[in-house]
């Protein structure tokens, strides 16, 4: 084992005049792990300070003996920023204008109470998703959306019919728009809305409606009407309202064995569709079903009204996720709760998916958020050959009319180039002239 040693001075600004430390704004911290040099290198730790105004992100590597700076990003203004490299050389940059036109073109004032990590631009290296802005793997700006500070962030393949990943972000700025959904690689705004002038403190994106392709998204001030409040789910592909219920706005979770998300809030797990919500019997206080109390257990979520788990992740590898809560009767004890519901699908361990694994690493940061997969599970479940009565076969699905494009994936759902290995098993998604999408699994011999 090697012991890390070494300290580095922070830029310790204070004072109300520049707002850096006013109202504790200079003492807001985030952290994550990111493969900034590619997935074949060691990951870097990225330590972050400030997101209401000034924003500093320090990427540091450990070589087995010492901590070494990879880069230090400083966004002290809305229109310029600095990056210090590993040799201590600092360069000032002027980025492109933000996609919202709000004038916040850097990380300055664009940060959330949370962050995300993933290779959103497909270059093999991770980017840092800040909320209304994103940082490239080299510490330079990838883009800025510019809607400002937010409370919730969700990164995933929300629209499986367009390339890349999407980001759903809710905004606390009380501005013209309370939320937006944008391209995670470019910052292009795909949808935006919500009640004008609202402090939108809650929001979630998840695939909860089986008959509606893609994710749904909803928030405390959702919808597209600036004058009225709407908390119903909307579809990320079409932008249309797809439900009359108000789902919980906390964590998504794979629990009951189908390929849609369930919802976790506090110590309750529910199944939500476009028109109904079903309690799955995982809760602490309900009198109508078996409770933890009846089993002599007293679990609790964390973070007060945020009601988040100690951790949610696919710990045991069957692709359904476990939840960790703490024992209110004995805080030194933890409960690990796992689904006992059967499933017909066999899906690769979620921790093999890079986006999901990075999400588990940053999950306990500030306002905790759930991890998401880097692929759209309903498109891949059959390709994983997870159906029990045909669990190992490699078979082609029927081909439909003219093929317009092909996209290749490995068994973890990650994009790959055209397969060349002699015995590689891979998945191909084909888009057809009639608008349909088929998925096939191949073994190259």
Model-inferred region functions:
Residues 1-391:
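Beta-propeller-forming repeat regions
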């Amino acid at each position: 084992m090697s012991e890390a040693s070494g300290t580095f001075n922070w830029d310790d600004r204070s004072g109300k005049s520049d707002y850096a430390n006013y109202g504790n704004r200079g003492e807001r911290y985030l952290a994550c792990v990111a493969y900034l040099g590619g997935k074949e290198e060691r990951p870097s730790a990225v330590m972050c300070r400030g997101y209401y105004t000034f924003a500093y992100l320090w990427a540091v590597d450990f070589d087995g003996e010492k901590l070494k700076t990879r880069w230090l990003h400083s966004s002290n203004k809305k229109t310029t920023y600095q990056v210090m490299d590993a040799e201590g050389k600092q360069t000032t940059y002027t980025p492109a204008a933000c996609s919202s036109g709000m004038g916040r073109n850097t990380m300055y004032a664009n940060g959330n109470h949370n962050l995300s990590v993933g290779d959103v631009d497909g270059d093999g290296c991770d980017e840092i998703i800040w909320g209304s802005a994103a940082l490239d793997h080299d510490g330079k700006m990838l883009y800025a959306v510019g809607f400002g500070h937010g409370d919730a962030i969700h990164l995933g393949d929300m629209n499986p019919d367009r390339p890349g990943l999407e980001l759903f972000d809710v905004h606390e700025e009380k501005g013209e728009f309370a939320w937006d959904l944008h391209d995670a690689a470019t910052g292009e705004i795909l949808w935006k809305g919500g009640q004008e002038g609202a402090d939108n403190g809650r929001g979630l994106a998840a695939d909860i409606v089986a008959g509606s392709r893609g994710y749904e998204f909803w928030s405390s001030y959702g919808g597209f009407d600036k004058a009225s409040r709407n908390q119903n789910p909307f579809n990320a592909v079409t932008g249309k309202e797809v439900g009359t219920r108000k789902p919980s706005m906390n964590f998504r979770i794979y629990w009951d064995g189908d390929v849609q998300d369930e919802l976790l809030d506090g110590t309750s797990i529910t199944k939500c569709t476009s028109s109904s919500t079903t309690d799955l019997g995982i809760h602490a206080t309900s009198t109508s079903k078996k409770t933890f109390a009846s089993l002599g257990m007293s679990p609790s979520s964390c973070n007060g009204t945020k009601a988040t788990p100690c951790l949610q992740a696919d710990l045991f590898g069957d692709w359904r996720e476990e939840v960790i809560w703490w024992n209110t009767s004995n805080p030194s004890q933890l409960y690990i709760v796992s689904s006992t519901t059967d499933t017909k699908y066999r899906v690769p361990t979620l921790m093999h998916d890079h986006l999901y694994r990075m999400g588990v690493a940053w999950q306990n940061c500030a306002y905790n958020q759930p991890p998401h997969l880097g692929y759209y599970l309903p498109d891949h479940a059959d390709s994983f050959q997870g159906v029990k009565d045909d669990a190992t076969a490699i078979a082609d699905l029927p081909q439909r009319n003219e093929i317009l494009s092909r996209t290749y994936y490995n068994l973890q759902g990650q994009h790959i180039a055209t397969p060349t290995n002699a015995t590689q098993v891979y998945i191909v998604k084909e888009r057809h002239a009639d608008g349909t999408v088929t998925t096939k699994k191949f073994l190259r011999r």
